[in-house]
């Protein structure tokens, strides 16, 4: 234990480490503020004027509007909302046009528009997947079989996207059949809030990699390794201690930073909206059987696993290479490779099995949860979020073992 404390103290004495940790905490606050600042709405006043609300004021005003639509998403409520929408459009014209009265939009459209979110998808063209216009949907077609119709749309989507893989189609339908219905809606929190959780995890991963790069390679450069090698605990035990100290620092930093980040978001947007079903914030045919509060927990857990897997790869490179700069450059390439692979080739094994596969932008874990990507091998199909988690878990242990092994072999050499 004393060796562990000494190693942790050594890491924290580095000015570079302290600066990077401070940046991590500052980013936690700054990146939580951004999606809050993006919120905006125009409020009509009794005297006919309009007040533009932004930030917390806009969020509070929207929360008051959304209260009337909170609850279970039943076919009857969707039908009623659609009838109201169509009635307003027939009387005042398209909602998107400038001539649509703001007072009517705020009173009759805004509170219920999220109830209508899934209708264009549900009634989409089965061949092209193009969503239906809300004015073309007959309210009488929204009946007790609404959720069965959603499942039919998922079947059409999977048939188009996984045409040659019936196993993937079947697995998606089976997963969708396990969802708890009717869905629940309490509007309030934006997609941006969840996107910025993922962005923050990406920046945390970069900062952790920057700190971890010098764990072993830094001592190779200074020659300190030659001195430590002559001590009683300068072999395997020292390698394990260094890795444990690094992991402890990164876990604490990650949890503190992400907790502060999420607490700021939840304080601003409220916690009632976290009861909303995943499908009511993203796509009506999404597969995860979770609400937005559970989504936050899953993103944190998956992000921590991916960060640790990426750091373990960096520690292996640090034990293998002779200078910190080389380690850092290779580690950054490995960290960003899934992002570029996904942009270039879409969902492939390369973009999902690397340690940082769940970290990034289009390729991040949230995007995979909201998508319908399946990887196929032989007659088997695997949903990409499962592949990412399993791969990261395996790589965490494999790269940690390789880091210890490489450090010991370096000593023998």
Question: Where is each model-derived feature located?
Answer:
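Aromatic- and glycine-rich beta-strand/loop motifs that create alpha-glucan
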Residues: 1-18
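Alpha-helical transmembrane segments of multi-pass membrane transporters/translocases
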Residues: 17, 306-314, 371-413
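Secretory targeting signals
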Residues: 26-89, 138-219, 240-320, 364-365, ...
């Amino acid at each position: 234990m004393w060796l562990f404390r000494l190693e942790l103290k050594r890491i924290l004495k580095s000015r570079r480490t302290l600066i990077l940790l401070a940046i991590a905490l500052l980013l936690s606050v700054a990146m939580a503020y951004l999606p809050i600042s993006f919120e905006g709405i125009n409020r009509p006043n009794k005297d006919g004027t309009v007040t533009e609300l932004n930030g917390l004021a806009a969020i509070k005003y929207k929360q008051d509007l959304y209260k009337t639509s909170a609850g279970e998403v039943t076919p009857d409520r969707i039908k009623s909302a659609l009838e109201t929408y169509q009635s307003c459009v027939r009387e005042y014209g398209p909602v998107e046009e400038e001539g649509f009265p703001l007072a009517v939009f705020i009173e009759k459209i805004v509170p219920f528009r999220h109830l209508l979110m899934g209708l264009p998808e549900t009634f989409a063209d089965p061949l092209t997947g193009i969503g239906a216009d809300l004015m073309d949907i007959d309210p009488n077609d929204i009946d007790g079989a609404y959720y069965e119709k959603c499942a039919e749309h998922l079947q059409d989507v999977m048939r188009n996207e996984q045409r040659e893989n019936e196993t993937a189609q079947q697995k998606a339908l089976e997963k969708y059949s396990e969802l708890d219905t009717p869905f629940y809606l309490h509007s309030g929190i934006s997609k941006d809030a969840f996107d910025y959780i993922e962005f923050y995890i990406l920046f945390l991963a970069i900062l952790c990699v920057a700190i971890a790069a010098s764990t072993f390679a830094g001592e190779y450069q200074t020659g300190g390794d030659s001195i430590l090698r002559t001590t009683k605990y300068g072999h395997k035990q020292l390698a394990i201690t260094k890795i444990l100290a690094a992991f402890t620092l990164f876990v604490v930093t990650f949890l503190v930073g992400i907790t502060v980040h999420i607490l700021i978001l939840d304080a601003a947007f409220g916690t009632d909206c976290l009861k909303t079903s995943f499908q009511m914030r993203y796509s009506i045919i999404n597969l995860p059987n979770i609400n937005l509060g559970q989504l936050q927990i899953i993103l944190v857990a998956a992000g921590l696993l991916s960060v640790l897997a990426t750091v373990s790869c960096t520690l292996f490179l640090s034990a293998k290479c002779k200078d910190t700069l080389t380690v850092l450059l290779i580690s950054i390439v490995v960290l960003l490779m899934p992002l570029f692979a996904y942009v270039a080739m879409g969902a492939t094994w390369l973009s999902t099995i690397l340690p940082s596969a769940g970290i990034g932008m289009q390729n991040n874990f949230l995007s995979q949860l909201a998508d319908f990507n399946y990887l196929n091998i032989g007659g088997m199909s695997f949903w990409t979020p499962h592949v990412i988690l399993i791969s990261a878990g395996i790589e965490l242990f494999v790269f940690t073992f390789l880091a210890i092994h490489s450090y010991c072999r370096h000593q023998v050499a």
